[in-house]
Design a protein with these regions (language model features):
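Hydrophobic transmembrane alpha-helices and immediately adjacent juxtamembrane helices
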Residues: 14-298
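Generic extreme N-terminus detector
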Residues: 5-6, 32
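Short hydrophobic targeting helices and cationic amphipathic motifs
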Residues: 6, 10, 20-21
Length: 300
């Protein structure tokens, strides 16, 4: 155990030293060249990225009887279980929640995409080690293909969400009669795109960290479990009465992206420009940081 611990310390030290030296030797001209090369390689290998993404989707359901149908069934079963468990506690609050199962579904859908994609990116180098050793492919293709394969699954799950929405609207169960739809519902692609950019940034950072610090996989699992309860997925934000806790939740970029998504598909109202700019700033900053760290520490 002590030997393993010392190895992890050495890996962290190597990571911090290399990153520190990269920052000290930062040159705008050289970094522009690296970034240009990054996107040039992306364009060159875009067909390979498509194939890697397709492979990841197929492998995910390869040994399953129901196959890709799990993209419908899994979020649906999760919604039913969480509605039974938390419905009586939070679902009765009709003032802040129109239809609790649909409210829960939207939150769970986005959060599941975030966690599954980042975990896939985190382990992408390890799971593709045989290919990396034999064939040259730009390294960022591996975390990126993992994220995009989960985005495909996420997009399919949107169809399940539509079916759930129609069911509760038609039956009027659990406040479903209060659901509405208009033009603003079509704008859901905007927060989806922002979330995808944010996830790519986080995924690039995690994939690099995992190379130097293997325990990050377990730390990230614990972090995602805690994060689930720190984002208003199963409860409305208005139910939090402590001001400083509410302020911390609002700082979380996932909250702003989730709220934007709900404003479109659940409340069918214009998106808040303040939330939109805040979420976009977080997404672009995280992507920029992810690309910088990746180029600094991984030879593409």
């Amino acid at each position: 155990i002590m030997t393993t611990f010392l190895q992890q310390i050495l890996h962290i030290s190597a990571f911090t030293d290399k990153f520190y030296l990269k920052i000290r030797s930062f040159n705008m001209k050289d970094n522009k060249t690296e970034v240009k090369h990054f996107f040039t390689m992306f364009d060159k290998y875009k067909n390979l990225l498509r194939e890697l993404t397709r492979k990841n989707v197929k492998l995910k359901y390869r040994d399953s009887w129901l196959g890709i149908f799990w993209s419908f069934l899994q979020p649906l079963m999760t919604m039913i279980v969480l509605t039974v468990v938390f419905g009586n506690i939070f679902g009765a609050n009709r003032k802040h929640i129109v239809c609790y199962p649909v409210y829960l579904f939207t939150g769970r859908l986005l959060f599941e995409f975030f966690t599954s994609s980042t975990k896939k990116a985190l382990t992408s180098f390890r799971s593709n080690a045989p290919i990396i050793k034999k064939v040259y492919v730009p390294k960022y293709m591996y975390p990126l293909s993992g994220i995009l394969s989960n985005f495909v699954t996420f997009s399919i799950s949107i169809l399940c969400y539509i079916c759930v929405w129609i069911f509760f609207k038609a039956t009027g169960l659990l406040g479903g009669a209060g659901l509405t739809i208009n033009f603003y519902a079509l704008l859901f692609v905007v927060p989806m795109a922002i979330l995808l950019i944010f996830v790519i940034g986080v995924g690039l950072i995690l994939s690099v960290l995992q190379v130097y610090f293997r325990d990050i996989e377990y730390i990230w699992d614990v972090f995602c479990t805690l994060l689930f309860y720190c984002v208003p997925i199963i409860y409305p934000l208005q139910q939090i009465t402590t001001p400083w806790i509410k302020a911390i939740i609002k700082i979380n970029p996932l909250y702003s992206m989730l709220e934007l998504f709900r404003q479109c598909v659940l409340y069918c109202q214009p998106m808040s420009w303040k939330l939109l700019l805040y979420a976009l700033a977080w997404a672009l900053a995280t992507l920029g940081l992810g690309v910088f760290i990746f180029l600094s520490l991984i030879h593409i």
